[in-house]
């Protein structure tokens, strides 16, 4: 089948909800992918931060194939080894107490919202149900996670949303202090680096002050690590770089290295909030996805994470010297590049694609989420192509 035939089938039969690259992918290996016409591309997207180990990692493939030969699905009515092992591993690396497995980041955030509401209801009754999130945040596309998302762009056409969500300006501590004085807040959900919002890191002083206020007023701190988690920023979780101790952490994207999975981790304080029957998922804790996630976590040893941090610093340094670059944001291998105002980021991405390198956007910024295994030569190649494209604009 040719690229044009695939695109036509897509146009005819798939709901047209995505602004796709003009590219039909056939296969991948490491940090490179090929289209159906035989063209090769260097990948700085990793499926929007999902393919942590790149494409077709041999150990990942071995784990997935072995599990497919045993159990592909069981439901959560039965115990399975992959989910039990994965839960233990996540608890050990996070310091939290329990894990619930879902299928996506939105599902993980929905679950975290339910935990926060139930914790508050059990302890305080019906008077503390409001959840604060931040302007410019992104937490998912379900009705409740859209309500939590602090971007009006995503709110069009879908009212009414789930009640009980309010958005505050990030890094404005006085606004947070003023709002929580009403004593009706059960939780705050935030990303320490706002990915879809433009790869914007929050201030450490703000985050630590918010955490302190939450502890005083028994407000749950939910950290959305859907995009930042599982080594993306150079530590297992981005919150670890800000010296935070969240009550709930949500995960997805890179956790299973390319298969659907979501999870929320619960600290001791809320570990027993959900009782049997309070929450569930038919496909959650899928044995194949959990086996894949175990393969990913096995690779993320301290030296591997140190290399992610080093490569991120190397990439940032190289980007600083490029023409039209105004600022660079992010942590580790989650990087945003802001250009001079006359540069159209969509044109940059399109022209880089024509030169064989795939990048993403985040609002007006170029976004880089390469596989964590990317090597120095590939980083340099990507920067060289970007420099060439920018020099011609």
Curated annotation (Swiss-Prot):
Cofactor: pyridoxal 5'-phosphate
Record-level GO cellular component terms: cytoplasm
N6-(pyridoxal phosphate)lysine: residues carrying this PTM: 253
Free-text comment on the cofactor: Binds 1 pyridoxal phosphate per subunit.
Pathway field: Amino-acid biosynthesis; L-arginine biosynthesis; N(2)-acetyl-L-ornithine from L-glutamate: step 4/4
Compartment(s) of residence: Cytoplasm
GO biological process, one term: L-arginine biosynthetic process
Positions of N(2)-acetyl-L-ornithine binding: 141, 281
Name the record gives this protein: Acetylornithine aminotransferase
């Amino acid at each position: 089948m040719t690229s044009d035939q695939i695109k036509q089938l897509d146009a005819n039969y798939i709901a047209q909800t995505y602004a796709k690259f003009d590219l039909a992918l056939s296969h991948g290996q490491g940090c490179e992918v090929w289209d159906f016409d035989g063209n090769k591309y260097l990948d700085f997207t990793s499926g929007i931060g999902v393919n942590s180990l790149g494409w077709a990692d041999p150990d990942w493939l071995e784990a997935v194939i072995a599990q497919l030969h045993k159990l592909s699905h069981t439901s959560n009515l039965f115990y399975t080894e992959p989910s039990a092992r994965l839960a233990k591993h996540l608890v050990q690396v996070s310091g939290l107490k329990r894990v619930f497995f879902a299928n996506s980041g939105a599902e993980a955030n929905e679950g975290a919202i339910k935990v926060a509401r139930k914790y508050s209801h059990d302890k305080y009754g019906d008077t503390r149900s409001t959840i604060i999130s931040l302007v410019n945040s992104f937490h998912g596309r379900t009705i409740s996670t859209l309500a939590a998302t602090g971007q009006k762009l995503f709110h069009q056409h879908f009212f009414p949303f789930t009640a009980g969500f309010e958005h505050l300006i990030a890094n404005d501590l006085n606004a947070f202090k003023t709002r929580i004085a009403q004593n009706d807040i059960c939780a705050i959900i935030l990303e320490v680096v706002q990915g879809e919002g433009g790869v914007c890191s929050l201030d450490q002083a703000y985050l630590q002050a918010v955490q302190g206020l939450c502890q005083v007023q028994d407000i749950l701190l939910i950290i959305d690590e859907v995009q930042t988690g599982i080594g993306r920023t150079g530590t297992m979780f981005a919150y670890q770089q800000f010296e935070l101790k969240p009550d709930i952490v949500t995960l997805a994207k890179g956790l299973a290295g390319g298969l659907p999975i979501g999870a929320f981790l619960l600290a001791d304080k809320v570990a027993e909030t959900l009782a049997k029957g309070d929450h569930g998922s038919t496909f959650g804790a899928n044995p194949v996805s959990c086996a894949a996630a175990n393969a990913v976590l096995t690779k993320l040893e301290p030296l591997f994470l140190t290399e992610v941090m080093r490569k991120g610093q190397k990439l940032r340094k190289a980007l600083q010297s490029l023409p039209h670059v105004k600022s660079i944001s992010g942590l580790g291998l989650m990087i945003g590049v802001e250009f001079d105002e006359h540069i159209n980021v969509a044109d940059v991405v399109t022209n880089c694609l024509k030169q064989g390198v795939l990048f993403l956007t985040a609002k007006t910024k170029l976004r880089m989420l390469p596989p964590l295994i990317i090597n120095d030569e590939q980083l340099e190649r990507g920067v060289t192509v970007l420099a060439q494209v920018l020099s011609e604009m």
